[in-house]
Amino acid sequence: MNPNQKIITIGSICLVVGLISLILQIGNIISIWISHSIQTGSQNHTGICNQNIITYKNSTWVKDTTSVILTGNSSLCPIRGWAIYSKDNSIRIGSKGDVFVIREPFISCSHLECRTFFLTQGALLNDKHSNGTVKDRSPYRALMSCPVGEAPSPYNSRFESVAWSASACHDGMGWLTIGISGPDNGAVAVLKYNGIITETIKSWRKKILRTQESECACVNGSCFTIMTDGPSDGLASYKIFKIEKGKVTKSIELNAPNSHYEECSCYPDTGKVMCVCRDNWHGSNRPWVSFDQNLDYQIGYICSGVFGDNPRPEDGTGSCGPVYVDGANGVKGFSYRYGNGVWIGRTKSHSSRHGFEMIWDPNGWTETDSKFSVRQDVVAMTDWSGYSGSFVQHPELTGLDCMRPCFWVELIRGRPKEKTIWTSASSISFCGVNSDTVDWSWPDGAELPFSIDK
């Protein structure tokens, strides 16, 4: 091949390569243009697609969080006894599982579910940080909640509020939580509605502001709670707060110079609120306060000679004022009023937190004798108990035409009565039924000490 032929051949090859490159570039440009056109077309239809997606998500959300107003206008359901509702076995499970060290558990229900609320100690059972958790008030305590009947663990629990004293309730539209924390001489109650801070209440007597350790009560969109500030062994200050969507709309201080109200157990009944409380000053029977939605109130003591506090004397002649015998100190408790009659929940022991029983005194709200017609045992005298409190299931949850009364019992284990480094509790609960029930004991059942205690 002569030089001219070589030049022509090389030139032809370059021309072909150039043409191929040009065709590829043109194809690339066309491809980009088509892709851009498709994206532009998609953007032009975004409103329709997104509208479909939003409609679907909104429909699902509404289905899961249907809002109602819990009116609280129903009367308590007629009942013959108490059926076991839940038992969490948290200390038994906590010997080998990740379970919170807690105290002061309580239950509250919305129109969709019931949850167990509790005050953690910022520690797990059988762990070094459980040491010293006998202490009531510390910066590590928090109000948390989990589905009723489940052992409270980091995996199923929801943080509610930093607190060493607390209450919570649902108005049908959202959860109200009240968490008190801070120093004894200046604690603050933080109110949250659906998890958002809405209000704070400062200690007004600077002597350990404290609240119910059980559910607040909601009526027609308003929720009501009672707080105490002042001595635990003398006259203190007691206030009722009316709260709407987390904001305090009204409050009053009780005029109760010879009464002592702590750790009240409250429930709605025919549009009003009834609270049965602890007298830690001088009463072995329980004080009560009843009020309407305007906070017009009445006060008194359960008259029955079947005494409800601990410590307490032998049953005998009661009083519609404080029964002073063995009246000092006390334990959180509850009762349910039915006209002149009353269901009284109490420890079986007169002097220690052992056992638990329900007593029906058909005239006990107004009469002072100690005659009763029903006794139902739920925790044996030989087993530990502790605090107890009321909660209700609204008709919007149960489908009944009345308010179902329920109660929970705290089963305290550990210090100061047992040889452990920790103090914690499990819980059981019962609801009133108008059918057959049974006497039995549903104890905590954990075998102590744990390995951390040895």
UniProtKB/Swiss-Prot annotation:
One Gene Ontology MF term: peptidase activator activity
Topology of this chain in the membrane: Single-pass type II membrane protein
InterPro entries (UniProt xref): Glyco_hydro_34, Sialidase_Influenza_A/B, Sialidase_sf
GO terms for cellular component: extracellular region; host cell plasma membrane; plasma membrane; virion membrane
Cofactor names: Ca(2+)
Main location group: virion
Ranges facing Virion surface side: 28-454
Region of interest (Involved in apical transport and lipid raft association), residue spans: 11-33
Glycosylation sites: 44, 58, 73, 131, 220
Additional remarks: The influenza A genome consist of 8 RNA segments. Genetic variation of hemagglutinin and/or neuraminidase genes results in the emergence of new influenza strains. The mechanism of variation can be the result of point mutations or the result of genetic reassortment between segments of two different strains.
Family: Belongs to the glycosyl hydrolase 34 family.
Name of this chain's protein: Neuraminidase
Native source organism of the sequence: Influenza A virus (strain A/Puerto Rico/8/1934 H1N1)
